[in-house]
């Protein structure tokens, strides 16, 4: 029995996730925005050319591993690396979801070993697996999103967890960039703050 079957919610049937375009439909109607898109809209979109300009204008450029590469080659390498990381992150998410829903998982990656260490800690804390990849929504604000993992705490509350497969989680942004909208203008444009806002 899956966790969704074990712990159903009355609103589960009202929402549908569309992987293409990363959109949601609530009661058959597309929501205005996903939580992920809402957070991204508060910050400047990544501009590879601007970043490359900055790298090439540094005094230390000749020592960079990208030195001697064309702009196109640098961007192609970044794109390939990003696609690979995304695929591996998706696989890890899927394997964790399968694990908590009682399916057999074969994954010998170091990241999955980290997860199994977390699993030991989770049991020690008395956290009970409650839901995986739980799609939720807020009708008044036309928002929707997917919660990676929910656990029930010993005191009966629900704790939200978010799986991340990244090289580093940084509080300080590249170039000390800040958010571009009033609500986030005092928040650094770094993955730590992006992830925190998604969970808020």
What residue ranges belong to the model's regions?
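Charged, glycine-rich intrinsically disordered N-terminal tails and low-complexity linkers that flank
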Residues: 1-91, 184
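Catalytic cores of nuclease domains that cleave nucleic-acid phosphodiester backbones
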Residues: 4-10, 74-186, 193, 197
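Substrate-binding/gating loop at the entrance of the active-site cleft, primarily
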Residues: 200
């Amino acid at each position: 029995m899956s966790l969704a079957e074990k712990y159903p919610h009355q609103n589960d049937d009202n929402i549908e996730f569309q992987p293409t375009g990363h959109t949601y439909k609530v009661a058959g109607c597309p929501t205005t925005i996903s939580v992920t898109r809402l957070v991204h809209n508060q910050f400047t979109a990544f501009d590879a050319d601007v970043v490359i300009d900055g790298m090439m204008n540094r005094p230390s450029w000749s020592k960079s591993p990208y030195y001697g590469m064309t702009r196109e080659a640098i961007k192609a390498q970044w794109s390939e690396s990003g696609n690979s990381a995304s695929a591996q992150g998706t696989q890890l998410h899927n394997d964790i979801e399968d694990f908590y829903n009682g399916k057999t998982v074969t994954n010998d990656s170091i990241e999955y070993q980290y997860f199994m260490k977390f699993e030991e800690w989770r049991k020690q804390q008395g956290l009970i697996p409650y839901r995986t990849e739980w799609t939720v929504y807020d009708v008044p604000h036309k928002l929707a999103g997917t919660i990676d993992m929910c656990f029930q705490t010993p005191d009966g509350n629900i704790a939200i967890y978010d799986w991340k497969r990244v090289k580093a989680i940084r509080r300080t942004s590249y170039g000390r960039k800040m958010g571009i909208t009033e609500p986030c203008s005092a928040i650094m444009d770094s993955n730590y703050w992006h992830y925190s806002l998604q969970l808020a």
